[in-house]
Amino acid sequence: MTELNEEATVNEIEQEVQEQQEQVSIPHIPPRPTRHSPPAIDPDQSTSTSNSTNHPVIPQRPTSRPTKSQESKIPQQETPQETQELSSSGKDESDSSAKQNFEIPVIPTRPSRQHSEEPIIPPRPQRTTSQEPVIPIRPESTKSHEDKEEKPISEPVIPSRPKSKSNKPVAPSRPESSKSVEPEVPARPTRDHLTEPEVPLRPVSSREEAKEGLDNLIDQLEKDLSETVEPSVHAPIEDEDESPIEPVPSASGLRLPSEVDQQQESEIQEETNAIAEGQLNSETINSSNTFGDGEVTPGNSTTKTSFKSDEDEDDEHANHLGTGGDSSSFDDDVETISQEQEDHLEEEQQQEQQQEQEQEQERAAPVVQSLGTAIEEDDQAGGDETDTERAEAPAEEPVKEEPVKEEPVKEEPVKEEPVKEGLIKQESKPVIPVIPSRPPKKASLSRSTTEEDSIGLDQSKPNINKPIIPKRPTTESLKSGDESTSSQTQQPSIPVRPTKSNSSTSSGSSETVTKSKPPPPKPKKLSSKIAAFQQQLFNPMKSGSSADEDENKGEGEQPKPRKAVDSSKFLSRFGGNAIPLPGMFNPGQIPMHARPSSTTKDDDNDDDKEEQGSSRSVENAPVRRTRGPRGKKLPKAVSEAKVESESKFCLESGELFGLVFTKKVEESVDGLNEEEVAHKSLEEEVTEVNVKPEVASKTVEKQEEEDDIIDEYEKDDDIVEKDEPKSENDVAKEEVIEAKIDESVTVPGEFKEDTKEEEEEKEEEPVHRIAVSTDSRESPIEEEEDDDIVIDKTGEEKLNSSNSSLVDVKQEMEDELSKNDEML
C-alpha cells in the first residue's frame, strides 16, 4: 500500500509539472535581468520587484513546512522554472536559468522524502479498525441476552434448552465415552423402533446410506472377482454370495460377512487356477480407493508383497506343471479384501450407534427439561432453589453469570443418560424418580458460592434493585435528617466524624461535642526551611496553647490566671533543661516542661489547683489511651523481683583518741620528796584511754604527744637564762646523759602494732622518751608502762644550762619526727 501511494503522488506531481510547462507565461521574462542590471524599463521594474521578491523566498520555505501544504505550493515554485526554459534571449537570463536549474532537483527530492513518510498515516486507522469490531460485539451479546430473557416469558420452557445444547461445542466429546459402552449394549437398534414415530427421518436416512454403501462394496467385489476368475468358476460364486450377504444390513452390528468369506475361500481354492500377482495387487489397490480410507500400503495390509522373488518362482513352476501353485497368494488377497470389508462395516456401525445415541439424548432432553421445571416448582415451594434452575424459570430476570454456570452443570447428567438408557430401555415413567436426584448435585455447587443470592432472587423483580439503589441513600438520609442542625454549621469536609460519635453517644452530648472543637486551622505552606525554622523559634507553643485554651473554655472551666514569674528563675534553669543557648526563648515562649515550680507555699497551692483543673479537663477530653499487647504477662521472677542496693563501703565507728584537761600541780613545800611529786604529776597529767580504737593505729597518738613535747621545749627556750659556770661534775653528767641518749633504749609495748618492715627501718634510730631524775644524777632512765614520759623542771634547767647539748637533742628529735612522718 505504501508503494502504491508513493507512485500515485509522484505521477500527480509529474502531470502538474507538464501542464505548467505547456502554459507559457511571457510577462515573467523581463524581471530576471532587472536583478543584475537595475537600469531598465520602469513599468517592467514594477512587475520585476514583485516577482523578484517571490523567487528567492517561496521555493525555500515550503521545503521545511509540513507535507500537506506542499502540493498547493509546488506549482508556485515551478512556474518560474517554465519561464526559465522558454527564456533564452539574454546571457543574464541564461545565467539565472542555469542557477535555478541547479535548484530544481533539490525541490522534488525533499517532498519525495516527505511523501515517503506520508504512508505511515494509513496503517494507524487500520489498527483502530481492527479494534473497532470489539465494540459492537458487546451490545450484540446484550441483545442476545435480552432475546433470551423475552423468549421464556412468551414461549414454553422446552424449546429454549435444545438451542443452548445445539450451540455447545462439547457434543463431540460425548460419543468417546459411549465407545467404551458399545460392546455391553448389543440390542440398541431394537429400541430405536420403539421411538421411531417421534423422529422417523434420522434413523431411516442413516440405515439406507449404510445399505447402499454395503451394496456398492459387494458389487465392486463381484466385478473384481469376475475380472480375475474364469466365468465357469465365477457363476456358482455369485449364487452363493447373494444368499448370505442380503441379510447383513438387518443384523445389528454382528460380523456375519466373516463366515461368508470363509465359504468363498474354501470354494475358490478348489475351483480357481493360478493368476498373476500383479493383476491382483493392482485390483486390490483400486478397490481400496473406493472405500475412502486411503490407499492400501504394505504396512497397512497383510499381503505378502515382500516375497516377490519366491512367488515368481512359484508362478513359473505352476505354469509348467499346470497346477495351482499360487493359491496361497490368492488366498492372502481375498483375506485382505474381507478384512477391509469388516473394518468398514465396524466403522459404519459405530457411526450409526453414535447417531442413535445423539438422537436419544435429544429426545430425552425435553423430557428432562419438563421434569426439571416440575422439580423447580417444588423447590420454589420449599425454598431450595439453585442459581441454574432460577435462570430457567420464565418469570424471573436472568443474571449474566447464570448462563455461564448452566453449561458445565448440564454436561454431567447428559453423559450419564446413555448408560442409564441402556439399562432402563427409555421408559418415561420409571425415569422420573431417577432425575430428581440430580438437582442436589447442582445445589452443592451453587451453595458453595452464595446462599444470600439465592434467597434474594426468589423475590420479585423490584426486590433485586432495591438493595442497590434506594437503601444506600436511606441510611445517609436518616443520619442527615436527625442531625441537620449540627451538620449545617460545620464545614462540608468534616460532617462524617460527628455522625460516628453521635451514633455511640446521646443526642444531647452531640451538641456539646460539635461546639467544643471547631475545625483546626490549616497550616500555611512554607516557602523555605528558613521560614520553618523561624516559625518554630517565634511561635513554638502558640498553636498548642490556643487549642488547649479553646478546649477548656468550651467545657465551661475557667482556670485562674497564672502569676507572673521572675526572669531570674528562668535564667537559673537554662543550664539543665537541654536548651542550647541562653536567651534563645523569651520568658513567655519557654516550653511548659521547662518552667520551674515556685518555692513559696502560696505558689504551691495555686499550682495544685491548676493541676487539678487540667487533670479534669484531660479526663473529660476524648483522648485514646495507648494500650500494650494483650495477653502477655511478665514472668513472676521479673515482675516480683526485689532489688537490694548494697554499697561497696563499710561504715565502722570507734573512738580514736581522748583528751583530759588537768591543772598543773605546784611544788610541795611540806618536805615531800621530789621523786614522789614527779610520780604523782605523771599519774595526774596522763591518763590511759579505757576504750581502745578499733581501726585507727597508735601512731597518730604518738605524733600528737611528740608535738606537744616539742612545743613545751620551744616555750622554754624563749626564756633567756644566765649562763652559769660549769663545774667538772656537771660536764661529766652531761656526757653520761648524751651517752645514754645515744644508746637505743626502747620503751616496752610502744611499737607492738607496727609491721616487721617498719620495725626493721626503725632499728637504726628509734624514737626515745627520756625521764631524768632530780635527786641522783647517776640513776638510770626510768621506763614507764604508760608510754608517756614527763621531764621535771630541775632536769630541764640542767639540760638547758648548756646550749650545745640542747641543740643536739632538738635536732635529733626533729629528725626522728620527720622520719616518722615519711613512714606514715
Curated annotation (Swiss-Prot):
Here the segments flagged for biased composition (Basic residues) are 624-635
* Skewed-composition ranges (Low complexity): 75-89, 499-516
Segments passing through the bilayer: none
Q: Where in the cell is it found?
A: Cytoplasm, Cytoskeleton, Actin patch
Query: Where does the record place Polar residues bias?
Result: 44-74, 279-291, 533-546
Q: Where is the composition biased (Basic and acidic residues)?
A: 140-153, 205-226, 388-428, 553-566, 722-743, 790-799, 809-824
Q: Where is the composition biased (Acidic residues)?
A: 343-359, 375-387, 703-721
* Cytoplasm in keyword set: yes
Q: Which domain of life is it from?
A: Eukaryota
A Gene Ontology cellular-component term: actin cortical patch
Tell whether Cytoplasm is among the UniProt keywords.
Answer: yes
Q: Where is this region: Disordered?
A: 15-645, 694-824
Q: Keywords assigned by UniProt?
A: Cytoplasm, Cytoskeleton
The family assignment reads:
Belongs to the AIM21 family.
Job of this protein: Involved in mitochondrial migration along actin filaments.
Q: What is this protein called?
A: Altered inheritance of mitochondria protein 21
From the UniProt record, report the name of the gene that encodes this protein: AIM21
